[in-house]
C-alpha cells in the first residue's frame, strides 16, 4: 500500500510539473515588461488592444535585414500594409510565416506585407527597448534571416531600432499585426495572435472601399 501511495504521489507531481511547463510555453511569446509610466506616476502606456482605427504609429528610422535604411515612408509605397510584429523566439510567429509569405505573393500590387523583428536590434546596439524588454541582440539578425529563408519569407523585415521600438511600444506579446494605410495609420484594431485569414479580409475590405 505504501508503494502504491508513493507512485500515486509521483504521478500527481508529474502532472503538476507538466501543467506548469505548458503554461510557461504558452506564455513564452509575451513581453513581461511593465507598462511605461512617467516621472509623476501617470500611466503613459497604451495597450495594443486599446488602439483604434486611425491611430498613427509615428516616425521611425531603422534598417532591414540586409542593412538598408527603412523609415515610415515605406508605408506610402502601397495603399495598405500588413505589418507583422514578431520575434525569433516565438513559435506561433514562425508557424504563421509560411502563410504570410504566401499571402504576400497573392496580394495585389497596391498592398504589401512588412515584418518587424522586435527582438533584433541593429548591429552595435547595446541597450534600449529591444534589448531590455525583449532580450534582443544583434545576433538575432542572422537568426531572423535563417527563419525567413526556412519559411519562404521574401518581404521586407525591419530591425528593432529604438525609434521602431518606440513606435510599437504598445506591443506586449507577439505576433501582433497592424493593418495600415499609406500614412501609417491603423485601419482597424490590431490582431493579437496569428490570424492570416483575418489580415487578408481586412485588406480586401479596405481596398474595396477605396
Predicted regions and their residues:
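N-proximal helix/coil linker or "cap" segments that precede and/or mark the start of modular domains
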Residues: 30-59, 76, 139-146
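Thiol-/selenol-based redox modules, centered on thioredoxin-like
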Residues: 176, 181-210
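Short, Lys/Arg-enriched N-terminal segments with co-localized hydrophobic residues
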Residues: 1-9
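Conserved redox-active cysteine motifs that mediate thiol-disulfide chemistry
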Residues: 85-102
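C-terminal motif of bacterial Sec signal peptides marking the signal peptidase cleavage site
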Residues: 24-28
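Short, internal strand/loop/helix patches
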Residues: 133-182
